[in-house]
Amino acid sequence: MTQDIHAHRILILDFGSQYTQLIARRVREAGVYCEIYAWDAPETAIRDFGAAGFILSGGPESMTVDNGPRVPEAVFQAGVPVLGICYGMQAMAGQLGGRVEASDHKEFGYARVRARGHSRLLRDIEDHASPEGWGLLDVWMSHGDRVTGLPPGFKLIASTESCPIAGIGDDERGYYGVQFHPEVTHTPQGARILSRFVHEICGCPADWTPGNIVDDLIERVRRQVGGDKVLLGLSGGVDSSVVAALLHRAIGDQLTCVFVDNGLLRKDEGDQVMATFARHMGVNVIRVDAEARFLEALKGVDDPERKRKIIGNMFIEVFDEQAARLTEVDWLAQGTIYPDVIESAGSATGKAHVIKSHHNVGGLPEDMTLKLVEPLRELFKDEVRRIGLELGLPADMVYRHPFPGPGLGVRILGEVRKEYADLLREADAIFIEELRAHDLYDQVSQAFAVFLPVKSVGVTGDGRRYEYVVALRAVETIDFMTARWAHLPYEFLDHVSRRIINEIPGISRVAYDISGKPPATIEWE
């Protein structure tokens, strides 16, 4: 029996902040398990969670209006520490007898906070020291309202020139509030502050580690499926690859993977998947060559949404055909991860600003008889990657750039043809190869080539060429919600362009996409 790595846990109540998942990731990085509930989740669910501490997120609402979101009474009745961040601090202060007011001076962006070191939360944590010896913190602010009166039992623990009450604390009860955001990277000491809260104040040990998570998942999978057979659709993406490695470690030959090669994958991707899983790891993988079927279904279709639906439906059709032949299978495995399952079902009133519901596979038939096993559903993407490394997957597979579900089908503008897919595969491979060779691959968040179905005149030697155009796209982003185009060196782009044009008959021109998100999206379709 492995140790219970969920025993010491933190509950984060989401008041609608864009940073709520970031709070959870920081707590997990500190080695402590946590979950996110909506601020108006049923009080019984909050009590039953058994939290060692609560974190109240920021949010877009105001405590100065009558119907602003409130902290559930179950939080203050639990007798455990509470940390309020931004709106969470204001809500806690207002409900415990303090005063919160709207302010004419809104504070967004960098600020320097004077940290009064007499609190358990901030003691000895600082970026700088003032001439008078006060500890100073560089932080990220994002607020309009502010606390103007301390609740009974609280003391001032942080302040700025424009926000005299930027942090409050009641050491006896373990209640703290900070007006700034410790979860963002713009607050350099933020990880230390959150670690201090979960470890020293809440008393949680650092049990949430990749090795412990793998042991826990293996034990739970074995308990869930017993001696039954399990089927997994293996795409070559990070999530399904980690599920395959994990299930193979847990149940061995009880796992069968179906890898559908739709002809819209990156260069040599199908062979790489088979080499990693079938030959190297010994996983039972059925490879289905369905290129002709996918291309036939896409013939004459140029609308991006129709292409997506056709590719998705065709994948399900091919997968179902294979599943029907495996009559002894009882379970369907999926690579659902935690952001997929944070949904409004946790909201009692329906007013909470929470992330939309999402299911890993939208095309599951209603009459499906297979039971679902989703071993990654508690994990964030960065945790999935660390688990992949722990399971022995190659780093270049685990840290590969995101690839859309429809594959090259949405990187070929307009109609998808085999000729276009073959040209794009080669151009994309050269771009990625050179990014790796110049140590640029890990400096960008996503990079790929796009096929433009237009011809452009070119010159080779004494002859003219009238051939196709590809665009290169590389972006830098933290969350993929916004992104800036990567400012790759001109010499590098020149080198890549010359290689593509010289080495790929059929391409005569290369463009570089310098559009940010917004206004553009990262993918072209």
Curated annotation (Swiss-Prot):
GO terms for cellular component: cytosol. Its EC number is 6.3.5.2. SUPFAM superfamilies: Adenine nucleotide alpha hydrolases-like, Class I glutamine amidotransferase-like, GMP synthetase C-terminal dimerisation domain. Pathway: Purine metabolism; GMP biosynthesis; GMP from XMP (L-Gln route): step 1/1. Coiled coil: none annotated. One of its GO terms (molecular function) is ATP binding. It catalyses: XMP + L-glutamine + ATP + H2O = GMP + L-glutamate + AMP + diphosphate + 2 H(+). Keywords: ATP-binding, Glutamine amidotransferase, GMP biosynthesis, Ligase, Nucleotide-binding, Purine biosynthesis. The active site is at C86 (nucleophile), H181, E183. It is an enzyme of class 6 (ligase). InterPro entries: Class_I_gatase-like (IPR029062), GATASE (IPR017926), GMP_synth_C (IPR001674), GMP_synth_GATase (IPR004739), GMP_synthase (IPR022955), GMPS_ATP_PPase_dom (IPR025777), NAD/GMP_synthase (IPR022310), Rossmann-like_a/b/a_fold (IPR014729). Residues 9-207 form the Glutamine amidotransferase type-1 domain. Homodimer. HAMAP family: GMP_synthase (MF_00344). Catalyzes the synthesis of GMP from XMP. This is GMP synthase [glutamine-hydrolyzing].
